[in-house]
């Protein structure tokens, strides 16, 4: 059910060390105005719908299907929200979940989303070169560290799955990786069946040109220029957690960018973290996406093992799930990481995961 794509020895050691540990899920919700650019993301069929994607996904995570959802899941171009996959696993195994508003389009209604406000702000478009205030980046990082320390004390000897929900987050990931000096062009993924590399690259290049960063920039300055609020918050949380706990950064390109950011922050600001406790975990739809190069990107960053669940929807009776097999949607809201954790911690099989996901999706399909 789990395949190691990079850093085989380290990946095997990480898997062995975290078998049968209880799981805690934490997810950084954020927004970047980059999501409003036409054709930048398929996570919401229109720019207007994409304003609410993270909030609707969070309501799904918190409550599952509700006939009168305050923020209904937005229509996608094809497929079904990955929040449905995450909700199925969280609900079935009663995994504690913490959702953090790092900077959303709007403050969610408390009756819809039980999330923790960490006083962030939504990001401006990457193309501005001024995505976030430096002070906001600093504050979000400190909040991440504090929450990581708090959760590590509350849940001893657990596996922490850290997810994200940021529409257009692969573009901010490309921005941060490029700003840190990685040659990530043509390597990131997308919610589209064919990754829109040229559009992403054009946006990133415009932003970096305006930002005019130093040759060896402070990683906080890189996030302030072309990043998003989730990245810096989750980086802080993962750094703190890694000192004593197992951490699975649940995502593809976006979490590889978070790992690269963590590594650079610790080096630049002389902080400690334990790379042995960290892996990046995603779906095979991301890891094997022929229109990106997640494996190449992981190898470029080095050190961190890239894992992917081998979960398959080929035999699903629902076309919305089968569309994942055709390259649509692929990942989000920690879905791949939670599937990995479900197998590691609770021995979940392919048949069991498919059954629980299909049970969870039925009321959504009936309502539409």
Swiss-Prot record:
It comes from the Bacteria. Gene3D superfamilies: 3.40.50.10210. Transmembrane segments: none annotated. InterPro entries: Nict_dMeBzImd_PRibTrfase, Nict_dMeBzImd_PRibTrfase_arc, Nict_dMeBzImd_PRibTrfase_sf. One of its GO terms (molecular function) is nicotinate-nucleotide-dimethylbenzimidazole phosphoribosyltransferase activity. Belongs to the UPF0284 family. This is UPF0284 protein SYNPCC7002_A1742.
């Amino acid at each position: 059910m789990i395949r190691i794509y990079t850093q085989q020895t380290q990946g095997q050691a990480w898997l062995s060390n975290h078998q049968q540990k209880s799981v805690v899920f934490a997810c950084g919700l954020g927004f970047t105005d980059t999501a409003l650019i036409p054709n930048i993301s398929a996570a919401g069929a229109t720019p207007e719908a994409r304003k609410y994607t993270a909030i609707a996904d969070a309501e799904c995570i918190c409550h599952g299907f509700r006939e009168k959802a305050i923020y209904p899941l937005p229509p996608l171009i094809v497929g079904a929200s990955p929040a449905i996959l995450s909700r199925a696993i969280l609900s079935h195994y009663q995994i504690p979940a913490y959702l953090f508003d790092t900077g959303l389009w709007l403050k969610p209604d408390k009756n819809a989303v039980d999330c923790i406000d960490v006083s962030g702000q939504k990001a401006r478009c990457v193309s501005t070169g001024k995505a976030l205030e430096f002070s906001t980046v600093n504050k979000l990082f400190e909040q991440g560290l504090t929450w990581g320390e708090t959760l590590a004390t509350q849940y001893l000897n657990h596996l922490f799955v850290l997810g994200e929900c940021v529409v257009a987050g692969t573009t901010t990931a490309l921005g941060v990786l490029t700003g840190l000096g990685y040659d990530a062009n043509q390597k990131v993924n997308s919610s589209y069946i064919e990754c829109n590399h040229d559009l992403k690259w054009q946006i990133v290049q415009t932003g970096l040109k305006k930002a005019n960063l130093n040759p060896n920039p402070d990683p906080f300055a890189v996030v302030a220029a072309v990043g998003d609020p989730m990245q810096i918050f989750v980086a802080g949380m993962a750094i703190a957690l890694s000192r004593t706990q197992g951490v699975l950064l649940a995502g593809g390109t976006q979490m590889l960018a978070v790992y690269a950011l963590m590594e650079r922050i610790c080096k630049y600001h002389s902080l400690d973290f334990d790379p042995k406790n960290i892996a990046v975990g995603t779906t095979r739809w991301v890891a094997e996406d022929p229109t990106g190069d997640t494996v190449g990107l992981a190898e470029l960053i080095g050190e961190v093992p890239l894992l992917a669940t081998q979960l398959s929807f080929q035999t699903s009776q629902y076309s919305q799930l089968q569309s994942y097999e055709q390259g649509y949607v692929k990942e989000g809201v920690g879905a791949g990481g939670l599937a990995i954790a479900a197998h590691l911690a609770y021995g979940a099989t392919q048949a069991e995961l498919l059954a629980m996901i299909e049970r969870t999706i039925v009321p959504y399909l009936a309502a539409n």
